[in-house]
Structures are given as structure tokens and as C-alpha cells.
């Protein structure tokens, strides 16, 4: 009799995805982040569910309900900080996952990559709306500033912003709908992640060399299941250390002040994982131009397959492209730092130069370097 694992309609799907899946024999730890993102998503949905049991999405009680969760609910403080810092871990894994894709040319799997870009936008939208829910000063003013950006859209902008707000300012209607969307989006993300995997399994995984690995495949289980478990243990170790020793390290102290529409904080800034995009937004003096640059800073990822001019897929054997890739990483760190600084000299000019370099590297320098490498290899 055939193994039930291979015949049962449900078990068969799991088997073909996580057990008998043929995987390249040489994929490194950079390929661990897909499973880590899955763990992060499950953790966020579970902790979020338990938080939603005690949270109230009303402007009068939202801040108090979060305080109540931390003070009165059994292990409420743990659930709340796991959720808040879990978001940070989620984004760390996301950035590393995308960086891996850029370095090793994984974007050549067009469908998988494009769904990944949509997933990135969805996670960013979810995180933004989640940050509004505790209804602290940064929640309120962050929501006001970011939603206001839509008013830069010609003709329909103002109406669009008021439609999203559900009034003439960020208020009760805004908070309620943000809670509703923040609750539903992770399930949409989970469904999209399933489609992401579906398309990945149509082609099989890429590998560090960028060469086809059809001649050398190994089963996913036990080789990569045990490797993923190690990755998961490290993720859990880092997250629990963060939550138990310095839960507010990555947060903003201003969010412990209840939202007050009459008092603007001196420096409005988003969570650390949005700072690079925020720096690009602020570096353009024009409102519409800034919004377009902000959107394009992420959307440019969708152009990566079109900008690939090299005859090789991976950067493993391309030293010039490697240098430019790490320059891009350094540039993103610079943008993240600038995004958290006040708008004054010398931060303004540093941010503008870093923003120009960001787009120059992706759109101009890296494609040229790839062509140069082709010529150097006489290809």
C-alpha cells in the first residue's frame, strides 16, 4: 500500500511542499528567511488575535485598553511586546529575504518575485495601520502625516483623504477602520504567501551559484527542515531577548503619551523599518514628487528583472556588482539613520545625496556594471 502521506488529498500538498520537495543541495542560510517569515506571520496572527480580545478601537478607550492589556491581562505585557517586536523581526527577515533575492538573482522568477513585492506592500500597510492602534502621540500624528500624503494626488487627493479618514481629520472613524483592516490584512498576506510558494514550487528554488541545480537535488526533509528549525530557534532567541530585556528599544517614547490633536510632537517619525522610505520622501521639497519617490523606492523592486543586464544570474562571480550591492546596503543604512534625524543641516543634504545614490545604483550603475562584467568576460 502507498504511503498515506503521498495519497491523502491534504497530506499530499504538505508532502510536496515540505517533505519530498526536491531542493538544491547547496542553498545557504540566506534561504532560511522564507520559513522565518512564515513563523513571524503565524506569531503575529496569534498574538494579534489575543490582543484583539482585549483591545477597543474607540478614540476614548484605545490608549487605556492597551494599558489595561499590559497591566491587568495575564501575560498581556508579554503578548503586547511579542507583537510589537515581532513586527520588527518580521521586517528584519523581510529586508534580508529581499536582499538575498537581489544578490542571487531570484527576481528572475517573475511571478514569485512580483507577488513578493505585493506582499512587501501589504506587510508595510499592515504595520502602518497597527502602529496607529495604541492611539499614542506618534500613532495619531503618524497617521495624520502619512494619510495626508494622498492629498498630493491631483484632483481627487483631498476627497480621497477625507474618504479614508471618514471625516475631516484622523478621528474615531479612522481608528475603527484601521483596526478592521489591520485585522483582515494578515490573512490576505497568508493567502498571498501561499500563492508565492505555489509559484516558487513551479520552478524550484534558485541557489547561490545561479546555475541550474536539476542534476543535484536533495529532499527537503530532513535536510532543510532541521536547518529551518535552527533558524527558527535563533529567531525566537533574538525575539525573546528583545522582548524580555529591552521591549521598548525600537519603539518611540512619544507613543506613551495619549494622542492629542492640539499638541504636535517635535519630531514626527515612523517606526525604524520605514525610516529609509521616510528619508526619501522628505528629501524631495515637492509634496507630489516626494510621494512618488516614496512609492517608487519600493516599486523599483518590480523593475529588477527588466534591469538585469548580466549574462549570469547570481552576483556570486561578479565582484563589481557585489561592490555596488554592498554600497546599496550601506546607502539604505544611511537613509534609515537620516529618516530618524530632524530636518536641518547637514542631515537634509546627506538625505538628498543618499536618495539620489539609491535610485542611481538600482536604475543606472548596477545595470552598467553588469554590462561591463559581460565585456570583461568577453561574453
Curated annotation (Swiss-Prot):
State where heme b b562 binds: 83, 182
Q: Which UniProt keywords apply?
A: Electron transport, Heme, Iron, Membrane, Metal-binding, Mitochondrion, Mitochondrion inner membrane, Respiratory chain, Transmembrane, Transmembrane helix, Transport, Ubiquinone
Coarse class of the primary localization is mitochondrion
Q: How does it sit in the membrane?
A: Multi-pass membrane protein
Give the UniProt entry's GO cellular component terms. mitochondrial inner membrane; respiratory chain complex III
- Kindly list the positions annotated as binding heme b b566: 97, 196
The keyword Iron-sulfur is assigned to this record:
no
Q: Which Gene3D superfamilies match?
A: Cytochrome Bc1 Complex, Chain C
Q: Which domain of life is it from?
A: Eukaryota
Note on cofactor: Binds 2 heme b groups non-covalently.
Per the record, the GO terms for biological process are: mitochondrial electron transport, ubiquinol to cytochrome c
Listed InterPro entries: Cyt_b/b6_C (IPR005798), Cyt_b/b6_C_sf (IPR036150), Cyt_b/b6_N (IPR005797), Cytb/b6-like_sf (IPR027387), Cytochrome_b (IPR030689), Cytochrome_b_C_euk/bac (IPR048260), Cytochrome_b_N_euk/bac (IPR048259), Di-haem_cyt_TM (IPR016174)
Q: Which compartment or compartments is the protein found in?
A: Mitochondrion inner membrane
The record's note on quaternary structure and interaction partners says: The cytochrome bc1 complex contains 11 subunits: 3 respiratory subunits (MT-CYB, CYC1 and UQCRFS1), 2 core proteins (UQCRC1 and UQCRC2) and 6 low-molecular weight proteins (UQCRH/QCR6, UQCRB/QCR7, UQCRQ/QCR8, UQCR10/QCR9, UQCR11/QCR10 and a cleavage product of UQCRFS1). This cytochrome bc1 complex then forms a dimer.
Q: What does this protein do?
A: Component of the ubiquinol-cytochrome c reductase complex (complex III or cytochrome b-c1 complex) that is part of the mitochondrial respiratory chain. The b-c1 complex mediates electron transfer from ubiquinol to cytochrome c. Contributes to the generation of a proton gradient across the mitochondrial membrane that is then used for ATP synthesis.
Q: Which family does it belong to?
A: Belongs to the cytochrome b family.
Q: What else is known?
A: Heme 1 (or BL or b562) is low-potential and absorbs at about 562 nm, and heme 2 (or BH or b566) is high-potential and absorbs at about 566 nm.
Specify the protein name: Cytochrome b
Amino acid at each position: 500500500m502507498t504511503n498515506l502521506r503521498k495519497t491523502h488529498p491534504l497530506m499530499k500538498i504538505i508532502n510536496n511542499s515540505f517533505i519530498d520537495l526536491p531542493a538544491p543541495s547547496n542553498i545557504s542560510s540566506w534561504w532560511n528567511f522564507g520559513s522565518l517569515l512564515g513563523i513571524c506571520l503565524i506569531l503575529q496572527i496569534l498574538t494579534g488575535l489575543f490582543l484583539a480580545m482585549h483591545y477597543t478601537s474607540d478614540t476614548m478607550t484605545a490608549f487605556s485598553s492597551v494599558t489595561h492589556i499590559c497591566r491587568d491581562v495575564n501575560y498581556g505585557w508579554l503578548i503586547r511586546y511579542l507583537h510589537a517586536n515581532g513586527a520588527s523581526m518580521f521586517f528584519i527577515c523581510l529586508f534580508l529575504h529581499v536582499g538575498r533575492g537581489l544578490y542571487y538573482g531570484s527576481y528572475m522568477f517573475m511571478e514569485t518575485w512580483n507577488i513578493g513585492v505585493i506582499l512587501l506592500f501589504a506587510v508595510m500597510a499592515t504595520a502602518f495601520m497597527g502602529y496607529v492602534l495604541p492611539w499614542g502621540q506618534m500613532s495619531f500624528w503618524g497617521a495624520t502625516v502619512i494619510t495626508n500624503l494622498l492629498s498630493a494626488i491631483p484632483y481627487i487627493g483631498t476627497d480621497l483623504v477625507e474618504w479614508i479618514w471618514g471625516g475631516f481629520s484622523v478621528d474615531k472613524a479612522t481608528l475603527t477602520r484601521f483596526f478592521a483592516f489591520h485585522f483582515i490584512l494578515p490573512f490576505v498576506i497568508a493567502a498571498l504567501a501561499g500563492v508565492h510558494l505555489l509559484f516558487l514550487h513551479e520552478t524550484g528554488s534558485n541557489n547561490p551559484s545561479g546555475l541550474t541545480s536539476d542534476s543535484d537535488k536533495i529532499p527537503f526533509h530532513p535536510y532543510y527542515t532541521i536547518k529551518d528549525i535552527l533558524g527558527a530557534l535563533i529567531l525566537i532567541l533574538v525575539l525573546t531577548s528583545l522582548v524580555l530585556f529591552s521591549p521598548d528599544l525600537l519603539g518611540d517614547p512619544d507613543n506613551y503619551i495619549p494622542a492629542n490633536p492640539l499638541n504636535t510632537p517635535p519630531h514626527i517619525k515612523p517606526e525604524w523599518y520605514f525610516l529609509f522610505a521616510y528619508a526619501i520622501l522628505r528629501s524631495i521639497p515637492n509634496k507630489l514628487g516626494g510621494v512618488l519617490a516614496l512609492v517608487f523606492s519600493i516599486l523599483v523592486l518590480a523593475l529588477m528583472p527588466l534591469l538585469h543586464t548580466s549574462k549570469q544570474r547570481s552576483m556570486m562571480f561578479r565582484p563589481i556588482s557585489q561592490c555596488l550591492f554592498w554600497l546599496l546596503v550601506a546607502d539604505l543604512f544611511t537613509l534609515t539613520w537620516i529618516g530618524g534625524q530632524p530636518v536641518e543641516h547637514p542631515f537634509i543634504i546627506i538625505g538628498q545625496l543618499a536618495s539620489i545614490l539609491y535610485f542611481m545604483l538600482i536604475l543606472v550603475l548596477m545595470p552598467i556594471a553588469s554590462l561591463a562584467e559581460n565585456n570583461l568576460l568577453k561574453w
